[in-house]
């Protein structure tokens, strides 16, 4: 039987506010346990929550960015459940009236096609604390630093049909929240976590199958692996005569398997009701327009502009626009070098390779945009060749200064004097007289292969400094003259 996969995602983004959503406690990551928890966060009696206006602004920003309905009358609710790291015995969230309603996001797939993914809603809520199972033998420690940290939970429609589509969607959300400056997107620190709802159904069937939710997956690679593992588990289970049970599961990267955590709850299990300590939030039109005016150019618009303004391919434009820092770096390189396609190639390939090897983000690049732009300018004005440029780039990455400083210090300036190149070619051809005779006696097909040998010898003789175009032209004339 052929199966169709149905995937919906819940993405929890930690908002980059200075303080928590209902208290003045700091949200700094990595502080000593329980040093950033106020009486409000601890759920002490007699204290009241006060809503963080900046968290509201950030949620509205996201809603506007995904063309969503904004809940101008939204309400906080209590989500009731017991867990040791939830000190109040309930989580303040939103249920019936969220701050962000229906919207959508277009994702670009590997084959270049664009698919629209519906966004059901996005709501504000507070994060829970953290249980520390490994720090105490036979006991569990509770760190409440994270309790009350503002989250925006983004819930998608079940519109994805493969793990790769799900990853593309998460990457698109990741890019948008970073562009907006509302979340740092640091998945290793838990700033962006994903719950994956996965079900299967016979191809052509309209009704959904029974879904399972994989909780708290925190990397793009693990999202893909966890979903594929769960898909295969459900297929094997049904084809062996079993039945999928609705449940919450955890992904174990060591075994590449999902395992049952608990039965999956429905909304009514949490007994939601409006929080009596918090008034409904009224968002005025003026607040909406003020927030809309602060929206930056977002990845889809930037991608389109890169294609139209710089003549880049869809793929190149998508890669360069995938992060705000990379897009800004690229544009600065272009403004200095004047050659967008050359800049795109160097930023994506050479610089990308360097950053991957060193485990750095582009904002930590050892080669600044000014340095790279200056070097590319020396390629376009024929001061250096592309081959020499790689040596210059490596030197800049090692802290040897600007391109001009490296070129002058190492004597790498390209030889463009025709007389000097001709003299060098004459010496090289004389040293390879036998190969010259073979070349002249060969047919056109063999000559093409042999010509590369002479070019290599010429560049070796000039230590890579001779202008490759001049070498090709003069060499051809001498060999066929």
Curated annotation (Swiss-Prot):
Q: What is its EC number?
A: 6.3.5.-
Q: Which reaction does it catalyse?
A: L-glutamyl-tRNA(Gln) + L-glutamine + ATP + H2O = L-glutaminyl-tRNA(Gln) + L-glutamate + ADP + phosphate + H(+); L-aspartyl-tRNA(Asn) + L-glutamine + ATP + H2O = L-asparaginyl-tRNA(Asn) + L-glutamate + ADP + phosphate + 2 H(+)
Under Pfam families, the record lists: GatB_N, GatB_Yqey
A molecular function (GO) held by this record is:
asparaginyl-tRNA synthase (glutamine-hydrolyzing) activity
* InterPro entries named among the record's database cross-references: Asn/Gln-tRNA_amidoTrfase_suB/E, Asn/Gln-tRNA_Trfase_suB/E_cat, Asn/Gln_amidotransferase, Asn/Gln_tRNA_amidoTrase-B-like, GatB, GatB_C_1, GatB_Yqey_C_2, Gln-tRNA_amidoTrfase_suB_CS
Q: Which UniProt keywords apply?
A: ATP-binding, Ligase, Nucleotide-binding, Protein biosynthesis
Which enzyme type, at the first EC level?
A: ligase
GO biological-process terms attached to the record: glutaminyl-tRNAGln biosynthesis via transamidation; translation
Quaternary data: Heterotrimer of A, B and C subunits.
What family, per the record? Answer: Belongs to the GatB/GatE family. GatB subfamily.
Query: What is the annotated role of this protein in its UniProt record?
Result: Allows the formation of correctly charged Asn-tRNA(Asn) or Gln-tRNA(Gln) through the transamidation of misacylated Asp-tRNA(Asn) or Glu-tRNA(Gln) in organisms which lack either or both of asparaginyl-tRNA or glutaminyl-tRNA synthetases. The reaction takes place in the presence of glutamine and ATP through an activated phospho-Asp-tRNA(Asn) or phospho-Glu-tRNA(Gln).
Q: What is this protein called?
A: Aspartyl/glutamyl-tRNA(Asn/Gln) amidotransferase subunit B
């Amino acid at each position: 039987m052929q199966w169709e996969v149905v995937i919906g995602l819940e993405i929890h983004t930690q908002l980059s506010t200075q303080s928590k959503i209902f208290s003045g406690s700091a949200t700094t990551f990595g502080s000593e346990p329980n040093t950033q928890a106020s009486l409000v966060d601890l759920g002490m009696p007699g204290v009241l929550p006060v809503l963080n206006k900046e968290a509201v602004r950030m949620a509205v920003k996201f809603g506007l960015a995904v063309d969503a309905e904004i809940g101008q009358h939204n309400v906080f609710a209590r989500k009731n459940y017991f867990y040791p790291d939830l000190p109040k015995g309930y989580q303040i969230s939103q249920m019936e009236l969220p701050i962000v309603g229906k919207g959508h996001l277009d994702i670009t797939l590997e084959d270049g096609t664009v698919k629209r993914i519906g966004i059901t809603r996005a709501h504000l809520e507070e994060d829970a604390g953290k249980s520390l199972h490994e720090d105490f033998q036979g006991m569990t420690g509770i760190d409440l630093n994270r309790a009350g940290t503002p989250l925006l939970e983004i819930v998608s429609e079940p519109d994805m049909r493969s793990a790769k589509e799900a990853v593309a969607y998460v990457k698109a959300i990741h890019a948008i929240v970073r562009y907006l400056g509302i979340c740092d997107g640091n998945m290793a620190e838990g700033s962006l976590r994903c719950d994956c709802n996965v079900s299967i159904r016979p191809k052509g069937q309209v009704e959904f199958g029974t879904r399972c939710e994989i909780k708290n997956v925190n990397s793009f690679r693990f999202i893909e692996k966890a979903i594929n593992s769960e898909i295969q588990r459900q297929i094997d289970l049904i084809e062996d005569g079993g039945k999928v049970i609705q449940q919450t599961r955890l992904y174990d990267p060591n075994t590449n398997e999902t395992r049952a955590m608990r039965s999956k709850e429905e909304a009514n299990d949490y007994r939601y009701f409006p929080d009596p300590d918090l008034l409904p939030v009224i968002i005025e039109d003026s607040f909406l327009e003020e927030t809309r005016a602060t929206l930056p150019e977002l990845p889809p618009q930037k991608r389109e502009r890169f294609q139209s303004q710089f003549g880049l391919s869809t793929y190149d434009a998508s890669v360069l626009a995938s992060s705000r820092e990379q897009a800004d770096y690229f544009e600065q390189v272009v403004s200095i070098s004047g050659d967008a396609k050359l800049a795109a190639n160097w930023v994506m390939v050479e610089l990308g390779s360097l950053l991957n090897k060193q485990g750095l983000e582009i904002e930590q690049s050892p080669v600044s945009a000014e340095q790279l732009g200056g070097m590319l300018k020396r390629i376009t004005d024929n001061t250096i060749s592309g081959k020499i440029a790689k040596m210059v780039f490596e030197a800049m990455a090692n802290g040897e200064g600007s391109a001009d400083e490296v070129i002058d210090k190492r004597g790498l300036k390209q030889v463009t004097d025709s007389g000097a190149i001709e003299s060098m070619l004459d010496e090289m051809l004389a040293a390879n007289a036998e190969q010259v005779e073979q070349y002249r006696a060969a047919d056109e097909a063999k000559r093409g292969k042999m010509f590369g040998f002479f070019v290599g010898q010429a560049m070796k003789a000039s230590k890579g400094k001779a202008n490759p175009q001049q070498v090709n032209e003069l060499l051809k004339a001498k060999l066929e003259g």
